[in-house]
């Protein structure tokens, strides 16, 4: 019963978070349909990544609705339970109340840190966080060539090349590409531009983490769905957008199911982490759109 309740709460939380995005009914339906297989896969493994994804989306939604204090709670809660919640800070520059958001982050960080001390000693809580950090560092090294972990852009490049190099050679350029659109300050006021940042942030979290596993791609598929319905290039590159979406559904989402030829899955997709390929191409296109499209001009 506990497991069933856990899965229902996580799924309900994610569904509610997506429903709060400013999407038309058909757009909402597309996002759900694109991601449903990966959400189902994550549910079967009782993955907390469902809840983390919901928190990141909610942090975006609450900043959009100017409820920065509660957005801070989502960011802190996600960060202090699985670290990935820190991605919510990607929307900081879109906040109209940055001081309120900053003070909220400090307030909730203190509350969430102290709360376990109601039933555990301060020493135990501090030691637990230190051990958690040490484990994350240790696992980062183990995951580099793990078949079932690091199913990311990092893992794909390591496995295809067979080379052992520092992930920083990929992460640093990735961070620069991710951050470059922030320079287009005039575009901040356009909702489509901000939506693309949500998609980019969710994809970045998956593509540039050595801890990414199959179940984590529910986050990426939600990001892909949001990009597809909110991209400003539907009129200029509709064929390419549709191709990338179908390619992503086939290789990223369905490659782990029995609908996909087993020999391709076992001999190519899994050994070379090719699940990351379509999402990488889409992420690069998102960054290109953010850097080149005029979001200020009213869209059709």
Predicted regions span which residues?
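Compositionally biased, low-complexity segments enriched in small residues
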Residues: 3-6, 77, 237
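Primarily membrane-embedded glycan-assembly and transfer machineries that use lipid-linked glycans
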Residues: 1-70, 96-217, 221, 295-296
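Transmembrane alpha-helices and membrane-interface helical segments
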Residues: 54-65, 92, 96, 100-101, ...
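Transmembrane helices and adjacent periplasmic/lumenal helix-loop junctions
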Residues: 75-92, 209-219
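Aromatic-enriched
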Residues: 228-300
């Amino acid at each position: 019963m506990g497991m069933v309740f856990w899965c229902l709460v996580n799924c309900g939380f994610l569904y509610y978070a997506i429903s709060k995005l400013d999407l038309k009914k058909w757009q909402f339906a597309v996002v759900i349909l694109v991601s449903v297989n990966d959400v189902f896969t994550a549910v079967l493994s009782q993955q907390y990544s469902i809840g983390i994804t919901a928190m990141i989306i909610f942090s975006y939604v609450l900043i959009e609705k100017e409820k920065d204090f509660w957005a801070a709670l989502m960011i802190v809660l996600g960060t202090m339970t699985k670290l990935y919640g820190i991605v919510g800070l990607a929307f900081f520059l879109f906040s109209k109340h940055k001081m309120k958001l900053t003070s909220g982050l400090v307030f909730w960080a203190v509350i969430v840190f102290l709360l376990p001390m109601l039933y555990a000693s301060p020493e135990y809580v501090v030691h637990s966080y230190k051990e958690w950090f040490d484990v994350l560092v240790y696992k980062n090294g183990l995951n580099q060539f793990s078949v079932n972990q690091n199913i990311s852009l990092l893992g794909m490049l390591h496995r295809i090349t067979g080379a052992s190099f520092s992930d920083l050679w990929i992460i640093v350029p990735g961070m620069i590409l991710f951050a470059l659109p922030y320079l287009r300050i005039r575009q901040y006021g356009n909702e489509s531009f901000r939506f693309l940042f949500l998609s980019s942030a969710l994809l970045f979290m998956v593509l540039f983490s050595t801890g990414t596993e199959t179940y984590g791609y529910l986050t990426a598929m939600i990001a892909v769905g949001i990009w597809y319905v909110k991209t400003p290039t539907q009129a200029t590159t509709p064929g390419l957008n549709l191709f990338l979406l179908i390619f992503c559904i086939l290789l990223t989402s369905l490659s782990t199911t029995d609908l996909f030829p087993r020999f391709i899955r076992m001999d190519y997709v899994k050994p070379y982490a090719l699940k990351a390929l379509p999402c990488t191409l889409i992420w690069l296109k998102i960054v290109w759109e953010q850097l080149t499209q005029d979001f200020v001009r009213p869209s059709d």
